[in-house]
Amino acid sequence: MPNHKKNLSLRHLLLTAAVIGSIFAVVFYILYCTRGLFNSDMAFWLLLADEQHHTGQFYPEGFYYTTGVPLPFISSQIIVFLLRFVCSNWILCREIAILIVTAGLFFLILLFYKTVISSYSSYLHAGITILLLCLPMMQYPQTFYEGAYEWQSIWELLLMIVFFHITKKTVFKKERSTILLFLSYFVILFFNSMSLRMLMILSFPFVLAYLFVQFQEVDYHFEKIFSTSKARLFTIISFAAMLLGFISYFALAKMVSLSSTSAGMTFVGQDVLFDNFKTFLSNVFYYYSAVNSTSLFSITGITTCLNFVILVVCAFVSPIWALIHYGKEKGTFLKFYTIYAWISNFLVIYFMIFTTANHYGYFRQVYWHNLIFTTLFLIHIMKKHDKYYEWVVILCLCVSVCCGHLNYLVQTVKPIHAQYVDEKQNGTLVEYLEANDLTYGFASFWNAYNNRVLSN
């Protein structure tokens, strides 16, 4: 008879090796591929950091804000700004900043599960979530190169951890701890509400989910929702933080003359609605890298098939399972998180279909919530059934990881390497333009940003 503890440790060692390997792969991709996958958004933030460095102003006068308004001390922008004092290489500063933010995200994933699960299996939960997040899909550019959407997950995790401690029944026994927790909650919700996107997909769904859970807890008696001092205080602080954040955002946008805001988002007409729906479905498959015009019997074809299975589990099976499974519970944090995530996902999908905000990048928050649901779903299967189910789950994850990273090396890293070799041998377009004094006349505004940074 095989030893159960030995089999258990082998399974966990295999999963641990896959997680560590995935983390090292992400570090390599960030350091090696960022320059090859550089785009105008990254150029904008680096140019802003350079202007901040030279002017000594966090919001330089006359700077053209096209991608967004950075918030002091709570974005990777401040890390790049500080690194510029010791490093002159713009892109390297950006890469180091993204590595720091990514490490912070991984740490918060572990802290989140240790807080809400509080058992040894929290490490297993964190490992599976990190493993799924590191799978090479179309979310990579926004997550690990631009770093634009990592902060959404970071702020959500911080908010959930603080909220969990606030809702613990023992929290009001220590007055100082209570004040600090509510102050932390106010600050986090305030800064989230200073971004219209975060207000719509995080702050508002969060407060709405809290009120809905409270409504259920009092057996659907509306007049009893605010019967406790904690509920009244929590609601007042929440709406105050959201309102102040909303006002502060527009005040800041006006101060820096932001060229475009989410206020420019409009509803689409009936003639465009069906096209938006088709675009949304296409974006979902694209985001999970579940579509590709390639041979079925190739590493890319196999990876595409595996990604389709992941899409089905992540986007359909696990969210529905979570709603059914945790919806039956009463007063649990995971029930609250499920309701919050469903409301947030619904709003994102609604805006992607019924408004002009149909870019695939908006799907990132839905993708993130589905990773959490998938982790909980897989752990449930592993715990409910015998060890052989655990072996099947871990082996499937490891196969997906190996195929995904191998395909990424072939389809993305290899062409970037060829690009670097060609640039080393033949020079770059920027070098040619500078050698011939052609410093103006770039093809477009975005290319001007891109080329200027890459020429540094």
Residues of each region from the PLM?
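Membrane-interface micro-motifs in multi-pass membrane enzymes
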Residues: V69, F73, Y120-T167, N358-N370, ...
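Short periplasmic/luminal acceptor-recognition loop of GT-C membrane glycosyltransferases, typified by
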Residues: E434-N456
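Hydrophobic, aromatic-rich transmembrane alpha-helices
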Residues: Y210-F215, T300-T332
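Membrane-interface alpha helices of multi-pass inner-membrane proteins
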Residues: S177-V207, A240, L244
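Hydrophobic/aromatic-rich transmembrane helices and adjacent perimembrane loops
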Residues: A148-W155, I201, I302-C314, L334-D386
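Transmembrane-helix motifs of polytopic, lipid-linked glycan transferases
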Residues: I20-F24, I96-Y120, L158, F316-W321
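Signature aromatic-anchored transmembrane alpha helix within multi-pass, membrane-resident enzymes
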Residues: R11-S22, R176, L180-S184, I236-A240, ...
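Membrane-proximal lumenal/periplasmic loop motifs of glycosylation machinery
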Residues: Y32-S40, H53-F81, I91-L92
